[in-house]
Amino acid sequence: MVNAVVTTPSRVESLAKSGIQAIPKEYVRPQEELNGIGNIFEEEKKDEGPQVPTIDLKEIDSEDKEIREKCHQLKKAAMEWGVMHLVNHGISDELINRVKVAGETFFDQPVEEKEKYANDQANGNVQGYGSKLANSACGQLEWEDYFFHCAFPEDKRDLSIWPKNPTDYTPATSEYAKQIRALATKILTVLSIGLGLEEGRLEKEVGGMEDLLLQMKINYYPKCPQPELALGVEAHTDVSALTFILHNMVPGLQLFYEGQWVTAKCVPNSIIMHIGDTIEILSNGKYKSILHRGVVNKEKVRFSWAIFCEPPKEKIILKPLPETVTEAEPPRFPPRTFAQHMAHKLFRKDDKDAAVEHKVFNEDELDTAAEHKVLKKDNQDAVAENKDIKEDEQCGPAEHKDIKEDGQGAAAENKVFKENNQDVAAEESK
């Protein structure tokens, strides 16, 4: 007698709607990744403890002392947290609502309809509708489906893979991406001023208007029968320069801040902004790319819309800007292209002695090889790894690494968080 083979649905949505009471073992995360996970709705209500800062961008374009005050507030949040809620950001509630309705309408369609837009991860094509494959360091899956595509500049987009239904998806998403691009310029200006640089310096360093890519990723997190055992998105930092995130007011974003997981509140009419690895590198670690993850719940479906602002993969060498380096603060990061930085994160999963993410260094540990490696002056010419990486796709997802928390707060081991064969490309992830 041949035993029947039980197959797990390829989409998390189908699995969630199948009526299961326990999640399949491939979705159960290792215990060390589950520290700090409780009832997300109760966590979100807590007022005690650290809170993600809220930055008011009203009159950020002002020429007077107000912009200097805004600069100080945003700079402080970027240095201390690397993430913030942006309010009075200049993007209308009407447009944001259109973007949300379009994304939710697409995911409300039957899975069979969405499969018409399925990506081909096995062949490196990550644009379109998909789910994470079991390619993280621990071999486990994430409780998430997604839709991913390049959103800006217009000449880099492939509209053929954008959803045709609803009809407002393309116009709403296109206009939103255009306005996020303008907002990114304003933020990069403030961050440049905060480092004592010329206003346009950081924008130039990440590719300028011509080459900075905006990648859209809609994350769909179905209800989960055992949310205490699963993760929607594994712990990671974004490789982007900046990441801008909308959500449907269902909590789920957690930040690893000062040795503990902090749940972000749902702030009405706000956009969450992350500082990514790219800006952290250029600022020599003055601005932080914070470790974060997405948790799930059994009561409500959660959506997030992430736009990752990424530099070109090969044109620019990412390294600390000369103005951020002193004898007391030598370069903390070796020079790499963006593609090499992504590959470094993707392929460090087996190098457990060296791959340590966001490690707190003592003075006598400055030579320790880690993800955020502190280089001595005589090592500044060290060659970045994985030099021969080629770009197979113009666009690739922007979330690229997993960090497994070791329970001690400071040292987190690098894991691979990739969309599968991502052209050593990336958002992910809120």
UniProtKB/Swiss-Prot annotation:
It catalyses: a (2R,3S,4S)-leucoanthocyanidin + 2-oxoglutarate + O2 = a 4-H-anthocyanidin with a 3-hydroxy group + succinate + CO2 + 2 H2O. Pathway: Pigment biosynthesis; anthocyanin biosynthesis. InterPro entries: DIOX_N, IPNS-like_FE2OG_OXY, IPNS-like_sf, Oxoglu/Fe-dep_dioxygenase_dom, Plant_2OG-oxidoreductases. Predominantly expressed in corollas and at lower levels in anthers. The keyword Ribonucleoprotein does not apply. GO terms for molecular function: L-ascorbic acid binding; leucocyanidin oxygenase activity; metal ion binding. Residues 376-407, 415-430 have a biased composition (Basic and acidic residues). Keywords: Dioxygenase, Flavonoid biosynthesis, Iron, Metal-binding, Oxidoreductase, Vitamin C. Fe cation binds at H236, D238, H292. Its EC number is 1.14.20.4. Its cofactor is Fe cation; L-ascorbate. Induction: By gibberellic acid (GA). Oxidation of leucoanthocyanidins into anthocyanidins. Belongs to the iron/ascorbate-dependent oxidoreductase family. This is Leucoanthocyanidin dioxygenase. It comes from Petunia hybrida. The lineage of its organism: Eukaryota, Viridiplantae, Streptophyta, Embryophyta, Tracheophyta.
